[in-house]
From Swiss-Prot:
HAMAP family: Bpt. Its EC number is 2.3.2.29. One of its GO terms (biological process) is ubiquitin-dependent protein catabolic process via the N-end rule pathway. Belongs to the R-transferase family. Bpt subfamily. GO terms for molecular function: arginyl-tRNA--protein transferase activity; leucyl-tRNA--protein transferase activity. One of its GO terms (cellular component) is cytoplasm. Pfam families: ATE_C (PF04377), ATE_N (PF04376). SUPFAM superfamilies: Acyl-CoA N-acyltransferases (Nat). Functions in the N-end rule pathway of protein degradation where it conjugates Leu from its aminoacyl-tRNA to the N-termini of proteins containing an N-terminal aspartate or glutamate. This is Aspartate/glutamate leucyltransferase. It is found in: Cytoplasm. InterPro entries: Acyl_CoA_acyltransferase, Asp_Glu_LeuTrfase, N-end_Aminoacyl_Trfase, N-end_Aminoacyl_Trfase_C, N-end_Aminoacyl_Trfase_N. The lineage of its organism: Bacteria, Pseudomonadati, Pseudomonadota, Alphaproteobacteria, Hyphomicrobiales.
Length: 249
């Protein structure tokens, strides 16, 4: 039996399961483990190749006869918010995001429970316990952080922190070429703020300030209404069999 070096990634294929995005379809994924000293560099390479991270696993779709899942990344330097995006930024100008280590809290979990119950109903993520949530946040061997969003405090111009209730949270990986938004959640009762849109816009701003060219959004799934929002952030690049291709409109 041949042996592989410990730091050489091994890839595996999942069994078929129902597709969560397209009714009547089945999905399969190819995945590997992100562990060890080279986990961060491997995560960089795999993300650039269309993989996503979930805890210490990197995966990408490997479905037979279906190519609906397309990796999308926003071109930060050339992105200019249109009128609707500027309105969202204005509506949330009273919020401030504070970077936190990838450490779960009970306050985060309470907001997460409210979000998944309101958005996803039952099953899947709605069944996640506090331990499951903790694993989602802290089971990482790469450069992962949280951004917590609250209303600005009276001294936020001097000390960048907010006060009051937690409004939104973004779990984000910092890559060599961008920010990868792993998972985000927010107060589902606040409809007029478009908080999901605001989190993406804020990460575009953060990536630009860090000198990073991309914000990775994961997969746009052609034919899935709940994933269609990812097409709005232009210009963007979509991963094809021929590499990343720029989309302007």
């Amino acid at each position: 039996m041949s042996e592989h070096p410990r730091d050489t990634p091994q890839f595996y294929l999942t069994a078929p399961s129902p597709c969560p995005y397209l009714p009547g379809r089945e999905e399969r994924k190819v995945f590997t483990h992100l562990v060890g000293d080279k986990a961060a560099s491997l995560n960089d390479v795999l993300t650039q190749g269309g993989f996503r991270r979930s805890q210490s696993i990197a995966y990408r779709p490997a479905c037979e006869g279906c190519k609906a899942c397309v990796s999308v990344r926003i071109c930060v330097d050339d992105f200019t918010p249109g009128r609707s995006f500027r309105r969202v930024q204005a509506d949330n100008s009273d919020l401030i995001g504070q970077i936190k280590p990838a450490t779960p809290t009970s306050e985060q979990y309470a907001l997460f429970r409210s979000y998944v119950t309101g958005r996803h109903g039952t099953g899947g993520m709605a069944d996640m316990s506090v331990l499951d949530y903790a694993m989602m946040v802290e089971d990482t061997h790469v450069h992962t952080r949280l951004v917590e969003y609250r209303k600005r405090g009276p001294d936020s111009r001097i000390i960048p922190r907010g006060t009051g209730d937690l409004m939104a949270v973004a779990l984000t990986d910092v890559l060599t070429d961008g920010l990868s938004m792993v998972y985000s959640f927010y107060n589902p009762q606040v409809h007029d703020r478009s908080l999901g849109t605001f989190l993406i816009l804020d990460h575009i701003t953060r990536a630009r300030q860090m000198g990073l060219p991309y914000v990775y959004l994961g997969y746009w799934v052609q034919g899935s209404r709940k994933m269609d929002y990812k097409r709005r952030y232009l210009p963007q690049e979509r991963l094809t069999p021929h590499g990343w291709e720029r989309v302007e409109k």
